[in-house]
C-alpha cells in the first residue's frame, strides 16, 4: 500500500488529506483545506498562499483518484465547489448527512450534496459499512465523537484500509484519541500504520481542558503499547501549536523508549513541521512561556479532575 500525505497541518495548512494507492485503486480521503489559525507563527499572506497552493495539489490528486472519502463536513475536510476535477465521475463515500450529525454539519452536508449533484458516478453513505474492491477492503467505523463525548462539533468516521495483510487506520478528527471508543477501535483492528489526529492544544484553557490533554497522552501511549502500528503519524490539530513537543513530551519520550516511530506528516517527508519552522524564524505569537506537561503534571491534573468528578477514578489506574 502506497501512502501520500497530500496536505496536513505540519505543512502549514488545516488539512488531513491523504492518498492511498492499494489493490489497483487510488483513494483520496478528506479532500479539504483551510488556512491556519492566527496563532500559527506564519504571516497571514503566507498562510493564505499555502492554502491556495495545497488546494491545487488536492485537485490534482483528486483528478486521478477513483474513490473519494469524506469523513465529516468541516471545511478542512471537504471542498464545497462544483468542481469536476475534484468530483467528476468519482465514487464518493460519505459520512451520513442525516443521522448522527449536528445541525451545522447537516446544513453543510446538504449544501455540499446539492453543489456536487450529478458530478460523482456513485454516492454512498459509509457509516459502519465495509466496501470491497478486487482484494481491497475499506471499512468505516460507526460515528465517533469529534473530540470529547457530547461535543457540539458532532461526529466523524474513522477509516480502515486493508490491502491483503497490510492494514492502515486513518482516524479523522478524534482530537487526540480522548474517548475510549476511538482507542478501542484501533487496538481491536491492530493496524500496521496509523494516521491520527492529535489533540487541539492551541485551545487549552478555552475549549480544551488540561485533563483531556492528560487523557489523550495516556490513550496514545496505550495505542503505542498495544498495537503493531509503526509508524504512527500524529498531526492535524496538534500541529497548530508550536508548544506541542513539550505538551506531548511524555508520548514522544515513550515512543523512543519502545522503539516506535512517532512522526508528523512533514517528518515522513523529511521536513521540519511548519509550526516549528515558523516559530524559529518569526518568534512566538500567542504563547511566550510554558512548561513541559510531564508525568508529574499529568498525575496532578488527573487527580484534580477525579476529585472534581470530571472524570471517573479509573483514569488514575492508567498513570
Regions found by a protein language model. Name each.
Residues 13, 73-79, 99-102, 175-180, ...:
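Active-site environment of divalent metal-dependent phosphoester hydrolases
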Residues 1-63, 112-181, 273-276, 280-319:
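Core dinuclear metal-dependent hydrolase active-site scaffold
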Residues 39-49, 104, 204-212:
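Short, flexible/disordered intra-domain loops and linkers
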Residues 43-94, 188-195, 202:
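Active-site metal-binding motif and surrounding structural segment of the metallo-beta-lactamase
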Residues 79-88, 105, 110, 244-247:
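Metal-dependent catalytic neighborhoods of phosphoester/phosphodiester hydrolases
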Residues 28-32, 65-76, 93-96, 169-174, ...:
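Active-site neighborhood of phospho(di)ester-bond hydrolases with catalytic His/Asp-centered motifs
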Residues 124-128, 212-319:
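Binuclear metal-ion centers of metallo-dependent hydrolases, dominated by the metallo-beta-lactamase
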Residues 21-29, 33-38, 79-101, 210-211, ...:
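P-loop/Walker A phosphate-binding loop and immediately adjacent motor/lid segment at beta-alpha junctions
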Amino acid at each position: 500500500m502506497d501512502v501520500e500525505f497530500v496536505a496536513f497541518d505540519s505543512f502549514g495548512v488545516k488539512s488531513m488529506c491523504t492518498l492511498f494507492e492499494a489493490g489497483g485503486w487510488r483513494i483520496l480521503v478528506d479532500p479539504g483545506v483551510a488556512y491556519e489559525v492566527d496563532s500559527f507563527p506564519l504571516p497571514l499572506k503566507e498562510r493564505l498562499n499555502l492554502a491556495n497552493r495545497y488546494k491545487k495539489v488536492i485537485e490534482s490528486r483528486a483528478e486521478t483518484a477513483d474513490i473519494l472519502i469524506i469523513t465529516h463536513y468541516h471545511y478542512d475536510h471537504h471542498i464545497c465547489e462544483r468542481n469536476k476535477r475534484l468530483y467528476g465521475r468519482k465514487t464518493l463515500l460519505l459520512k451520513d448527512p442525516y443521522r448522527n450529525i449536528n445541525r451545522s454539519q447537516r446544513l453543510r452536508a446538504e449544501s455540499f450534496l446539492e453543489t456536487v449533484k450529478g458530478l460523482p458516478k456513485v454516492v454512498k453513505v459509509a457509516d459502519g459499512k465495509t466496501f470491497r474492491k478486487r482484494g481491497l477492503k475499506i471499512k468505516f467505523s460507526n460515528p465517533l465523537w469529534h473530540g470529547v463525548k457530547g461535543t457540539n462539533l458532532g461526529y466523524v468516521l474513522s477509516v480502515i484500509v486493508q490491502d491483503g495483510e497490510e492494514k492502515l487506520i486513518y482516524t479523522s478528527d478524534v482530537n487526540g484519541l480522548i474517548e475510549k471508543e476511538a482507542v478501542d477501535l484501533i487496538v481491536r483492528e491492530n493496524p500496521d500504520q496509523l494516521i491520527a489526529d492529535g489533540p487541539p492544544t492551541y485551545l487549552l484553557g478555552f475549549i480544551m481542558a488540561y485533563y483531556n490533554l492528560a487523557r489523550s497522552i495516556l490513550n496514545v501511549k496505550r495505542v503505542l503499547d498495544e498495537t503493531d502500528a509503526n509508524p504512527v503519524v500524529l498531526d492535524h490539530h496538534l500541529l497548530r501549536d508550536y508548544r506541542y513537543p513539550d505538551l506531548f513530551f511524555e508520548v514522544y519520550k515513550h515512543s523512543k523508549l519502545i522503539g516506535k516511530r512517532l512522526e508528523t506528516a512533514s517528518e515522513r517527508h523529511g521536513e521540519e513541521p511548519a509550526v516549528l519552522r515558523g516559530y524559529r524564524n518569526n518568534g512566538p505569537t500567542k504563547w511566550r512561556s510554558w512548561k513541559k506537561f510531564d508525568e508529574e503534571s499529568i498525575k496532578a491534573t488527573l487527580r484534580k479532575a477525579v476529585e472534581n468528578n470530571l472524570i471517573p477514578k479509573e483514569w488514575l489506574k492508567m498513570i
